[in-house]
Amino acid sequence: MLQIGTTFSKTATKILLCGAGELGKEVAIEAQRLGLEVIALDRYENAPAMQVADRSYTLSMLDGEALRHIIEKEKPDYIVPEIEAIATDTLAKLEQEGFNIVPSAKATQLTMNREGIRRLAAEDLGIPTSPYAFADNKEDFTAAVDAIGIPCVVKPIMSSSGKGQSVIKSTADIDSAWHYAQEGGRAGKGKVIIEGFVDFDYEITLLTIRHKNGTSFCAPIGHIQEDGDYRQSWQPHPMSDIAVQSAEKIALKITEALGGWGLFGVELFIKDDQVIFSEVSPRPHDTGLVTLISQDLSEFALHLRAILGLPIPNITQHGPSASSVILPTGHSTETQFSGLEDALKEPDTQIRLFGKPEIAGRRRMGVALARDTSIEKAIEKAKASAMAVKVDF
């Protein structure tokens, strides 16, 4: 039976977030609602989740020694990775020593690295994926592009939010794609994945929750990506019963292999009734921000319930809903937002401003959420709400 102690006492139940961005912030808020003591880590000061945490630390989480020092000092009950760039070998050792890594050190290690998760899905589990190859030098990269064929997609094996990703549309793009991937990779030592182009009708995120009573699925989330990063999402995305069943079967298979309790964002391509696996994140997914308005339990609430071993008897859908990101371009440490009166004038609209302390170039600074009588109306309402928010630098 779960017992939650008193914060700032010897009985406190502590959750430590490795990553303090906007998704971590929502997890921290859900943890606060249940009386947990929240510690947030990130590589920069005043990150969004730090603003609602009880304590925070600034460090590179790729520094295993520094990460271990904080974890041994805090002795958290739950260690929850919220980003990919973490010293996963250190987490694996800490798990062996008795610390609780969410959902598991194995899941964190494999999904941090596109090579690990792709080999697990395609080679170990036999799940349909796009054609792929890996390369860690320019010569092998050029050969892999030739073998996979053009057009193809190039991604660093370790990156997020579209960093380093590009599409090779002709041989003239090969050099620039290689160099762009090298700039965008975090800790992958220059290695990239080359993926064959997939002919698909649409792509979805299937939020999959592994909890003490089994596995639950949220309604499919459709989304639009630009430059490898999410711009809009909506729920539910219409799918045939056959496609939904295939998607859930694949999601169940991959999440069972990763193990542990928590929410997973499983990304899938759909062509007619055929489902092709793309990626999986063992944590809340950015496209799942729409669940803040579309469901009675958001993806963040579901993640926390699963982590704590609490019941998830059902997930109630409120109706057609959408999200649209607020994505300004500028340079400032004193960003100001206006236009909220216009952004929120329609019923069933919400705004989340993430509280990021700095913008340097283009950065996701918030999201508009909307609900309506149809997906199309919800998307338009969310877009209009996001566009109404003005950003001054």
UniProtKB/Swiss-Prot annotation:
Binding site residues for Mg(2+): 267, 279
Keywords associated with the record: ATP-binding, Ligase, Magnesium, Metal-binding, Nucleotide-binding, Purine biosynthesis
UniProt keyword Transmembrane helix, yes or no: no
GO biological process per UniProt: 'de novo' IMP biosynthetic process
Positions with a binding annotation for N(1)-(5-phospho-beta-D-ribosyl)glycinamide: 22-23, 82, 286, 356, 363-364
Involved pathway(s): Purine metabolism; IMP biosynthesis via de novo pathway; N(2)-formyl-N(1)-(5-phospho-D-ribosyl)glycinamide from N(1)-(5-phospho-D-ribosyl)glycinamide (formate route): step 1/1
EC number: 6.3.1.21
Domain of life: Bacteria
Classification via InterPro entries: ATP-grasp, ATP-grasp_carboxylate-amine, ATP_grasp_subdomain_1, PreATP-grasp_dom_sf, PurT, PurT/PurK_preATP-grasp, PurT_C, Rudment_hybrid_motif
A GO term from the CC aspect: cytosol
Gene3D superfamilies with a match to the protein in the record: 3.40.50.20, ATP-grasp fold, A domain, ATP-grasp fold, B domain
PROSITE patterns to which the protein is assigned, alphabetical: ATP_GRASP
Binding residues for ATP: 114, 155, 160-165, 195-198, 203
Gene Ontology molecular function terms on file: ATP binding; magnesium ion binding; phosphoribosylglycinamide formyltransferase 2 activity; phosphoribosylglycinamide formyltransferase activity
Domain ATP-grasp: 119-308
Reactions it catalyzes: N(1)-(5-phospho-beta-D-ribosyl)glycinamide + formate + ATP = N(2)-formyl-N(1)-(5-phospho-beta-D-ribosyl)glycinamide + ADP + phosphate + H(+)
Record note on quaternary structure: Homodimer.
Listed name of the protein: Formate-dependent phosphoribosylglycinamide formyltransferase
Encoding gene (name): purT
